[in-house]
């Protein structure tokens, strides 16, 4: 096949062939002289014409393909592809559409970024089941809420999920896992924005500047993307003015106010607020003979919301987001036990492609502090800082 393609290319590149005995080139001929000369090697000439036609057709397909993927660049072409005098056949258009669809699975094909949205719910379900430990409740609630929202034919508001639990229980981990399965570029996607309260909005005196910048980013992202995700870490430390800014983005809206279809948006609010009451409820249920997997949202929802509302250390509980019930779901992250920490240690070894022993897993898991003092049941740091502790046991 390679040699066949080579000879076809050679035929296209060779100068016009002459029959034996013909004179070499001695200068330009007039059109009358060229017309009087017999056409040499008729069969080869016909083959060359067919190949040139095929080449022109290939160029036309490529032009249509590139214009489909990058319409902005298509308009800038200085030399348009010469027409063949007939329209592109239906089978050619279908082939072009199939090729475009396949290409867009791997490459960014549009300036809007929407062709990089994957919504891989199968991958999300697998990641939550395999990589997240001790959070059967959060796994179920996150998957059901996000999948249900994105599969709705039309939406009337943004989806607002509030993650609550102690540090190291997996709130950030789940947020990143979610983004990685909804967007091919993960956290690098133009449709994803992450804000850390103490990093992006550290000084209360600059709150007006923060509000202006935050509003600009959210508006630009929603204008660019039909599906956007906004992550707010340490949400309990957000300034009241910034919480108020989120209100119109989370309120229900009718399609008439925004055109035919509302852009979909997911807001994730990550907070340590309510972690203590979650731990108290879980500890009480375990002492009463319940298994961890039997704990449901009904056990935790009311105590968690009550704790958030009465918290004096944060303006989150007194914000209009809660008063107007704009948060769709409060998702509790349970405290992690020794067995869960041990699984996190194993994953950390595997993630760094390091060999491990059962003794090494136990050694690192025992380095963590466990509470309450009497029961020593829950890791006070969850699975945080485990990767750094691996270095302490390496030879």
UniProtKB/Swiss-Prot annotation:
One of its GO terms (molecular function) is ATP binding. The keyword Plastid does not apply. Transmembrane segments: none annotated. One of its GO terms (cellular component) is endoplasmic reticulum. N-glycosylated. The keyword Glycoprotein applies. InterPro entries: ClpA/B, P-loop_NTPase, TOR1A_C, Torsin. Keywords: ATP-binding, Cytoplasm, Endoplasmic reticulum, Glycoprotein, Nucleotide-binding, Signal. Pfam families: TOR1A_C, Torsin. Belongs to the ClpA/ClpB family. Torsin subfamily. May not form homohexamers. This is Torsin-3A.
